[in-house]
Each structure stands twice: as structure tokens, then as C-alpha cells.
Amino acid sequence: MGGGKHGRGGKHGGSGKSRVWTIVLIVAAIVLVISLGVLGVIGYGYWHGTKVYDGISATSGLAKEETALADMTVNWDALREQNEDIVGWVYMPGTSIDYPIVQGENDEEYLQKDFTGSTSGLVHKGAIFLSADNAGDFSDSNSFIYGHNMNDETMFAHILAMTDQATFDAARTFYILTPTQNYRCRTYALDVVKNTETNILQPNFADEAAMRSYMTARINDSAVGAPTDVDLASVTKLFTLITCGDDYANTRAVLCGGCVEQAAPANAE
């Protein structure tokens, strides 16, 4: 009888373990399905965000094949119909940087809101925006333009990639296009700074000497070797592109560009 009881007890224990494993497998399956669903939603968010900006790029009518700076025109009226905060366009040949520039009431407005005004979804590419502390017509000596460092290598992700010397050297020119003036810029430094470092954010300078001192400081702190083809003495206007660093929350990658040519676009307002 004792043996019989033992036998029944062993069988009951096996059945209990079976139920436990069944529950574990069910929970694991549910977690897997949820995880795949979340990844799918995130993947769609990246894809959709890219499609949105591809459409905006088509609307801009930017003639990228033009070699003359004045012939690089943008359909500002069409873009204003989508967003009245439009102030310019940034384009860096050979990279994914090709976006409208907006200016919000503060520097938080377009961190999650894209050019169309949407903040929906799990992925927020936001918009490329001019600092609210800058003049909206880019009349400051140094204009600061921000964009997210996205995992799908869109928006301003390429800027962080330029901490690699070869990548930096491969794309040295970018354009800032506005309704009244077009600017061709050459990069002269790429600094990686703490997000608490504010002395880099100087929109204007007391005199030319102060501006040269600022540029020299950027070169001295550069994460890549400074090029020698930018005559600092001839540069009178700066454009600074900023994105998150590798750790996102604590550092910023700061791409410094000096204007080497400017011209009124053929459709200047």
C-alpha cells in the first residue's frame, strides 16, 4: 500500500510540473508576440517618418543638380502651406541630411512634433529646427540648427558618424537655403561636448577677433583633424549643426560650418 501511495504521489507531481511548464510556455509565447508587435510598431514608425520627409522633400522642389548657388531654389509657398514655421532648408550632399528647417516658440516644441505637426506613434523624429534664440532670418553671426540622432541613420544621425575622420572628410559641404539667401558652408570642426556646456552657443560676437577666437576654440576641441581649406579670416558667418552624442542624454555632437559663399536665390522673396 505504501508503494501504491508513492506511485500515485509521483504521478500527481509530474502532472503539476507539466502544468507549470505549460503556463511558462504560454507566458513566453505571449511575451514574444507582444515584443514582436512592439518591434513592428517601432519599425513602422521609422518607415512612416522617413516617408513623411521624403514627401516633403518632393514638395520642396529643390533643384539639387544645380551647381550655381543662386539656382538652388525651394518652393517656399508649398512648404508654408504645410507649416508656417518653415524658415529654411538644410542639405548636405552625399548624406541623408536633406530637410526643412523650422523655428518654434522654444527649443522643445519640435523635439517630438514633426514638420506636419504630428506627434503620434512610438517613434518621434521631430523636425530639424533653428534655435529659438536665433533670428529667424539667419541674420545672426552663428545660427544653431538641431536635429535628432535617429537609429535608422536619418535626421542628423550622420553628424555623429562624422566623428570618424574618413566620414568627416567625405562630406565637407552643406547648404543652408532660405527665402532670401542661400549659403554654401564648409565644415571646419566637429566637437563632442557635454550637454551642459553652453559657452559654445554664441549667436553673435563682439568683433571679428572674438569670432576668430571662437572658431579656433572649436578647432582645438575638434574630435577630428581640422581641415586646412577653410580660411578663417574670410569667414563672416557660421552655421552650427547639433545632435545627440552616443549616450544621447549627456553629450552633443556639434558640427561647425563656415559660410564660404552666399547668393540670393533666383526666386528670392
What do the PLM-derived regions correspond to, one by one?
Residues 1-20:
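N-terminal Lys/Arg-rich, disordered targeting/topogenic segments
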Residues 35-269:
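Solvent-exposed, non-transmembrane regions of membrane-associated and secreted proteins
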Residues 24-40:
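Hydrophobic membrane-insertion alpha-helices, especially the h-region
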Residues 15-21, 48, 71:
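Non-membrane alpha-helical secondary structure
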